[in-house]
Design a protein with these regions (language model features):
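Domain-terminus/edge residues, biased toward the C-terminal soluble/receptor-binding domains
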Residues: 140-141, 152-273
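Sec-dependent N-terminal signal peptides of Gram-positive bacterial secreted proteins and lipoproteins
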Residues: 4-22
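Non-catalytic cell-wall polysaccharide-engagement segments
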Residues: 3, 130, 254
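Active-site-adjacent loops and short helices of periplasmic peptidoglycan-processing enzymes
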Residues: 18-161, 165-172
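Amphipathic, positively biased hydrophobic alpha-helical segments used for protein targeting
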Residues: 14, 42, 50, 72-73, ...
Length: 273
């Protein structure tokens, strides 16, 4: 009898967790929550809608640079590297290491850093070609990029699902992860603070990338690791992105915990979408 009461209590708790998890309400036009290790989608909202992704593009730019450039190599900044929008405030004539530019790209979201790094890859056009090749290798089947900084373009788009695939791939690159998880960097005579508030506000956040243009709205890619599980969240065109990412992680990790408890009780409940 006692065992039955315990089992009933556990099942009631699992039911409440499931009900709570299903009640996800976020503001994003498109979103995905993915298990980075398995690729399983835990939550989705318009996951395959082609959308502008703004500076979250820079995740892909950084990965291309890390595949083709040495961190200690330098780039001489020119007037052509000056760009509208967010900046790490490069000055024509200065020489900056690729590593410093990567911090400027991923923390300060510098559009100037993106163009300078593209130069290190042979120029903007070769860099963009490499970005699209890498996107294809990753399995981003509904994406196309036409610049390294994420500024709006008719042929520059991705989906929440594809961006989650990109983030999961990026987690396997230790240098990328080291840089994007840094809250404040002092490098190359500069101090740069990461735009990603989740690093300071969400337990286990490992970073990733923010983005914004007027047309794209707010875009955000993030990742969180807890007790050996890593989840990736993507929201596109989301004016409430910080709160929505917290909601998605609470949802995702709660469902994972519920599934584990069910397994421990010998039940085969399905707690994933």
């Amino acid at each position: 009898m006692k065992g039955r009461r315990v089992a009933a209590t556990v099942l009631a708790m699992l039911f409440l967790l499931t009900q709570r998890a299903w009640a996800v309400d976020i503001s994003a036009t498109a979103a995905v929550l993915m298990d980075a290790d398995t690729g399983r989608i835990l939550y989705e909202k318009n996951p395959d809608r082609r959308m502008l992704v703004a500076s979250t593009t820079k995740i892909l730019t950084a990965l291309v640079v890390l595949e083709s450039c040495e961190l200690r190599s330098t780039v001489k900044v020119t007037q052509e590297h000056m760009a509208e929008g967010s900046s790490m405030y490069l000055k024509p004539g200065e020489e900056v290491t690729v590593e410093c530019l990567l911090y400027g790209l991923l923390l300060a979201s510098g559009n100037d850093a993106a163009l300078a790094l593209a130069e290190a890859c042979g120029g903007v056009e070769p860099c963009v070609r490499a970005m699209n090749r890498l996107a294809g290798r990753i399995g981003m089947t509904d994406s196309h990029f036409e610049n390294p900084n994420g500024l709006d373009g008719e042929a520059h788009y991705s989906t929440a699902r594809d961006m989650a695939k990109l983030a999961s791939y990026a987690l396997k690159q230790p240098t990328f992860l080291r840089i994007c998880s840094t809250t404040t960097a002092h490098v190359g005579g500069r101090t740069m603070t990461n735009h990603n508030r989740l690093l300071r506000e969400v337990e286990g956040c490992m970073g990733m990338k923010t983005g914004y243009t007027k047309a794209a709205g707010r875009t955000l890619v993030s990742c969180v690791e807890r007790e050996g599980r890593t989840l990736v969240a993507v929201t596109l065109q989301d004016g409430n992105d910080w709160a929505d990412h917290r909601t998605l992680y609470e949802f995702g990790f709660s469902r994972a915990d519920a599934a584990e408890t069910a397994a421990a009780c010998g039940r085969k409940e399905r707690f994933w979408i």
